Amino acid sequence: MKSHTPVLHKFTRVAVITALLVLVGCGSSGTPDSASENSAPTTSAAPFVPASFDWKACDDSASTTSVQCGTLEVPYDYNNPSAGTFTLYVKLRPATNPSLRIGSMMVNPGGPGFGGSSLADDADYYFSSDLTDHFDIIAWDPRGTGKSTPAVDCVDNYDQYFGLDSPPDSPEEKQALVDASQAFNDECMANSGEILPYISTQASATDMNSIRQALGEDKISYFGFSYGSELGATWATMFPQTVRAAVLDGAVDPNSTSAEEGMAQAKGFEGQLATFLAACSKNKACEFYNGGKSEAAFDALLLDLDAKPLVVSAERTPVTQGVAFTAVAQAMYSDYYWSQLEKALADAQQGDGAGLLKLYDDYYQRKDDGSYGNELEAFLAISCLDDPGATSIKAVDDAVPSFVAVAPRLGANFGYGYSCALWPVKAAVKIEVTGKGAGPIVVIGTTGDPATPLASTRKMAAELEQGILLIVEANQHTGYGANECINTAVDSYLIDLTVPVSETTCKI
């Protein structure tokens, strides 16, 4: 059974830093009369019955010719199926040992906003051979994302929105963030306003049930990472009788407010950054050693970037303080990236911001040709729809000191959440996640996860009727694949339904 560097399933449900147009505190705003009213899909009112899949060879599956592709039409609104339809893009990776096949396992990589269909192509990397022997892997692009249509489409040039200097330390910088947030929202409404009321987590959870029905299975297994934990827990709460087994890795607290989860994330990233800098100060081989004073050097560098951003290219955003914070956030998802961050910070001290810009680009999934997918746009649209939060600029500003109190270095970057405060679509009605009637659900947390801190993962396990918590001691986001201990516990549960002992800890 293999282990590997885990998948970095970003974005998490709340924003990582303010350069994301500060998505912490997403929710409904003072909404215009034309904004849509959203309700959670009901499981009894909708007469919608999905068609079966017509699987065909894929034209984009790089890893194996066995992967098949299909589509599934689902309604915008399950309570009003005539309102319009999404066409979900779905991939099937058949079990590699048909004689051992148990059934289908749906998988989601996180987000929200990430298309997940590629997990079928890369199943051999993400999952053990025991799992791929026993399960058909079903991976899909949730409504509004990836190759599912229509997809959220807001802007083409991220730099003009996310490269701004942040946190703001002048009225002019603050107004620039507000203006950029409003402009981004306006573009989203202009290009995708028709679908924005219909891409909530609850709607995607209902799509999962439609996919199950289209597969012809009474019960189904599920493996979700990061935000995929919230999606899976929502599905298990709405359709408990259809759950065979479910694993939620890098789990969020599903019933927290966006402010509470934002505070937890700010504290988590602050803690990981402190761990990184302390380790660097103790290790002369660290490229950002600075005579054992990495912490002071980091603070000084960020002040320098605030005063004088580094220009890497005339065609790109300068490396502002906000860009640097994004780069740091990217590296905090796993200590695998820490050596890259060491060099990037050291280079920036010498006036070269290319390394920080590369990490920034990696965070935003910038492609080699300079284009972007729609991940961040869909992330914003889904997050703002899902989470009631600050509904005015003043409310956002008033919350910032609380973020700074729990995270002195990074807190302000989490606190400024203008985009969702200005979002033009009313928030969806949330359901309380309980998993009641779904049976045992395995929840995985790591001790050094900044994006979904262990404290939040514990809350997920506690709020589920039968949540089983597994802990991995590691500095990374998500735990499956880290070592044989966690793989064995998870695989035995999914394959044999052997429920592990809660609070089991796996050490790297």
Question: Where do the protein language model's features map onto the residues?
Answer:
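Bacterial signal peptide processing site
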Residues: 27-30
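Flexible "cap/lid" loop of the alpha/beta hydrolase fold
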Residues: 252-270, 343-344, 353-368
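Structural motif
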Residues: 310-326, 332-337, 369-377
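Bacterial N-terminal signal peptides that target proteins for export
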Residues: 2-15
